[in-house]
A protein has these predicted regions:
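Glycan-recognition and catalytic cores of secretory/periplasmic carbohydrate-active enzymes
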Residues: 1-224
Length: 224
């Protein structure tokens, strides 16, 4: 680390930086970061998008070999970036759809899964969204991420199935709330673990996703 030599062969997945730089330009007019964002997009195209190794970038999980600890977070965030930045480009929307398929296939659980004592699957609140391979359990922020992406995909394509899926996860979000305080709890489990208030950043992500979906439903009454 002292001389800049990588400590592991893992690649950075710079999606959060791309979205930050784009937001600085769109919201604050600070466009000097646009070229940096485009360079990061080109880097992503030659690495993660090419290999489809959406490995987790969590600060509390050690680096792993390729494909052992994938997560859907950066894949979904990049899909949201594509839908926001290039809403009229069919190829961008299709790439976002591919990323959504990956996230749903690997991390969304629509009904009670097979029994597994180690992860307490019989106590999960479903439908739910799992966080990462190394922590394959339902987390509220993971559900929030899929709610946001399903909503964005619906708004770009008009596919009512996307909206229906967003609503199903949102309904589960309300069932997972603390019944007394209304706080969005981190762990979607019907046990003592589920009573832990958990991470405030996860709760705020859930609140933002629910508010956004609520505004959409107030504007539209689609036939589901």
């Amino acid at each position: 680390m002292k001389d800049g030599t990588p400590v592991a062969s893992n690649q950075c997945v710079p999606v959060p930086m791309i979205r930050l730089f784009e937001r600085l330009g769109a919201q604050y007019g600070e466009t000097e970061f646009r070229e940096t964002a485009e360079r990061a997009v080109r880097y992503l195209a030659g690495t993660t998008l090419k290999e489809f190794n959406w490995e987790g970038q969590f600060e509390d999980i050690a680096p792993s070999v390729p494909y052992v600890n994938n997560t859907k977070h950066n894949a979904c965030d990049y899909a949201l970036y594509l839908l926001d930045r290039f809403p009229d480009r069919p190829e961008a929307v299709e790439q976002a759809r591919t990323l959504l398929r990956f996230a749903e296939d690997q991390f969304v659980v629509w009904e009670q899964p097979m029994p597994d004592k180690s992860t307490r699957t019989d106590q999960w609140i479903t439908p739910c969204v799992l966080e990462q391979y190394a922590y394959y359990v339902p987390i509220d922020a993971s559900a929030a991420k899929l709610i946001s992406l399903y909503q964005a995909m619906y708004e770009r394509t008009g596919n009512v199935l996307d909206l229906a899926k967003a609503c199903e996860l949102a309904n589960a979000m309300t069932r997972a709330q603390d019944p007394e305080t209304g706080r969005y709890l981190t762990y979607w489990e019907r046990n003592e673990r589920g009573l832990d208030p958990g991470w405030i950043n996860c709760a705020t992500a859930s609140a933002k996703a629910m508010m956004s979906l609520g505004r959409l439903l107030e504007r539209k009454e689609p036939a589901l």
